Amino acid sequence: MARIAGIDLPREKRVEVGLTYIFGIGTSSAKKILKETGVNPDIRIKDLSEEEVNLLRDYINQNLKVEGDLRRDVALDIKRLKEIGSYRGIRHRRGLPVRGQKTKTNARTRKGPKKLVVSRKKK
């Protein structure tokens, strides 16, 4: 099993797809990595030689910010936005959409489940 950036990559997947299991690497980044290192993107992860795995691992460690480092940087960026009181920071603090989406009817993912308002019966 290939282990890159602390992640066990799935053995049966193609290398191009397997690299996307690492936080911070998408499909375009995976294609670029494979092109730069010269590894065949159609080969399965289980068929990679130890030399190719080390080549990928070294390239990712030297050139990309992935997993823990990237998560920490994103968290610090959000914390900074909250501290300076920017509009985006306020939206993060309130748990609302940050990028200008409408919130009258949608935004259930950010806002969470509906809070039911129970009206009392008048006597």
Swiss-Prot record:
GO aspect biological process, one term: translation
PROSITE patterns for the chain: RIBOSOMAL_S13_1, RIBOSOMAL_S13_2
Disulfide bridge map: none
Keywords linked to the UniProt accession: Ribonucleoprotein, Ribosomal protein, RNA-binding, rRNA-binding, tRNA-binding
Keyword Glycosyltransferase: no
GO cellular component annotations of the record: cytosol; small ribosomal subunit
Region called Disordered, residue ranges: 92-123
Keyword Plastid: no
Entry GO MF terms: rRNA binding; structural constituent of ribosome; tRNA binding
Pfam families for this protein: Ribosomal_S13
Stored InterPro entries: Rbsml_uS13_C, Ribosomal_uS13, Ribosomal_uS13-like_H2TH, Ribosomal_uS13_bac-type, Ribosomal_uS13_CS
Subunit record text: Part of the 30S ribosomal subunit. Forms a loose heterodimer with protein S19. Forms two bridges to the 50S subunit in the 70S ribosome.
Cited function: Located at the top of the head of the 30S subunit, it contacts several helices of the 16S rRNA. In the 70S ribosome it contacts the 23S rRNA (bridge B1a) and protein L5 of the 50S subunit (bridge B1b), connecting the 2 subunits; these bridges are implicated in subunit movement. Contacts the tRNAs in the A and P-sites.
Protein family membership: Belongs to the universal ribosomal protein uS13 family.
Protein name stated in the entry: Small ribosomal subunit protein uS13
Source organism of this protein record: Clostridium tetani (strain Massachusetts / E88)
